[in-house]
Amino acid sequence: MFWDSIPVPKGTHADFAVAVTDDSLAPWIKKGGTAYLRRNTELYDGDVGLFETDAGIVFRQFCADCRGTVYLFAVNRAHAQDDCMIPPDKAASLVCYGRLELKKPIPLPMD
């Protein structure tokens, strides 16, 4: 995976940044904005990560149930059809490049 190097401001916890080229993170980060990410950090329910999935490399909101099933929700609920479920036997191979650093958490979808 390759992307243009975007400088990360000092004083942030981010390790790298990527340009947001669509509305997948709206309304929190708009198209044309910058997403700041932190590598090698544990994900908790509600965290947004940059994942490698069958659909490509995408931003998704993470949630795992007590059985080990992982749910990756589209942050922009206009794209709810892009939500995916990863069964426990495949969840261990899920690749996350980093957790999105935000000032406020994004609520998990209720639909």
Predicted regions and their residues:
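Extended boundary segments
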Residues: M1-S5
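Acidic/glycine-rich C-terminal interaction modules and beta/coil loop segments
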Residues: V8-D111
